Amino acid sequence: MAPGSVSSVSSSSFPSRDTSPSGSCGLPGADKPGPSCRRIQAGQRNPTMLHMVLEALKAREARQGTSVVAIKVYIQHKYPTVDTTRFKYLLKQALETGVRRGLLTRPAHSKAKGATGSFKLVPKPKTKKACAPKAGRGAAGAKETGSKKSGLLKKDQVGKATMEKGQKRRAYPCKAATLEMAPKKAKAKPKEVRKAPLKQDKAAGAPLTANGGQKVKRSGSRQEANAHGKTKGEKSKPLASKVQNSVASLAKRKMADMAHTVTVVQGAETVQETKVPTPSQDIGHKVQPIPRVRKAKTPENTQA
């Protein structure tokens, strides 16, 4: 086939392109000049009516609220493409839903109902920001120095940094804990005092007193008694001789007292004689009897 025939077939097989003006859409009556079909189909979407009402209240925020008329004027001025036929109904529904959800309120002492009166936004509750824990000055300084000199630290500096971290992580004991532990250590268990068995004084035989089994103090202590006993034994020997001498002197005195004078008349002369009685048994010294000695009899024959 000739090359010319191919071109003729291809041109006849495919339909010719539409040479209609840009404004036409292939619909009847589309030849009229006007906006393109794409613009009409896509359109400009408006936000919801509730969103527009909230935006109007934020823009015209007042202390006593914003009236419904002011809300309408704001929406129509900013969104001119809103459907005017349904605008009143949509606005009433948006105000009711906003009040039901707690987004809108009426000002105090307001008696209006429906899509009348004025509205205002509900104030949001103020939330207190949680205070972040303040980092210590030493920790912040250590972080800054560590970030700056991380690549330039030597072995000695690395060792120091690890020591600093260990010291910071160390938990220091609280003062209250130390104060509470101190009296516990100071307290010591009292030693059990064993009561000594009660003993009576054998020498005196006196009963014990009520105060802890202590004996009643006497005039002479045991030490004095012991000292007296020692001195008594030492002085007993010279005293024995003195006692004997005193007994002898007493015997002589008694003998002298018992002696009486007897007057004897001998002629013209009178003689006084003193008779001394023999010592009796009640005198201190007893008279020992003289032993009798038998005389040996000699026979007469022997004498001769």
UniProtKB/Swiss-Prot annotation:
Q: What GO terms describe the biological role, i.e. biological process, of this protein? A: epigenetic regulation of gene expression; meiotic cell cycle; nucleosome assembly
Q: Taking every annotated instance into account, which residue ranges of this chain make up the domain H15?
A: 45-123
Its transmembrane ranges are: none
Q: In which tissues is it expressed?
A: Oocyte-specific.
Q: Where is the composition biased (Low complexity)?
A: 1-24, 132-144
Query: Region (Disordered): which ranges?
Result: 1-38, 110-248, 270-304
Query: What does the entry list under GO cellular component?
Result: cytoplasm; female germ cell nucleus; nucleoplasm; nucleosome; nucleus
**Gene3D superfamilies on file:** Winged helix-like DNA-binding domain superfamily/Winged helix DNA-binding domain (1.10.10.10)
Sorted alphabetically, which keywords does the UniProt record give?
Answer: Chromosome, Cytoplasm, DNA-binding, Meiosis, Nucleus
Name the source's superkingdom: Eukaryota
The compartments listed are: Cytoplasm; Nucleus; Chromosome
Q: Where is this motif: Nuclear localization signal?
A: 154-170
* Skewed-composition ranges (Polar residues): 270-281
List compositional bias (Basic and acidic residues) regions by residue number. Answer: 153-166, 189-202, 225-237
Q: Which PROSITE patterns match?
A: H15 (PS51504)
Recorded GO molecular functions are: DNA binding; nucleosomal DNA binding; structural constituent of chromatin
Pfam families recorded = Linker_histone
Q: What does this protein do?
A: May play a key role in the control of gene expression during oogenesis and early embryogenesis, presumably through the perturbation of chromatin structure. Essential for meiotic maturation of germinal vesicle-stage oocytes. The somatic type linker histone H1c is rapidly replaced by H1oo in a donor nucleus transplanted into an oocyte. The greater mobility of H1oo as compared to H1c may contribute to this rapid replacement and increased instability of the embryonic chromatin structure. The rapid replacement of H1c with H1oo may play an important role in nuclear remodeling.
Q: Which family does it belong to?
A: Belongs to the histone H1/H5 family.
Protein name according to UniProt = Histone H1.8
Taxonomic path: Eukaryota, Metazoa, Chordata, Craniata, Vertebrata
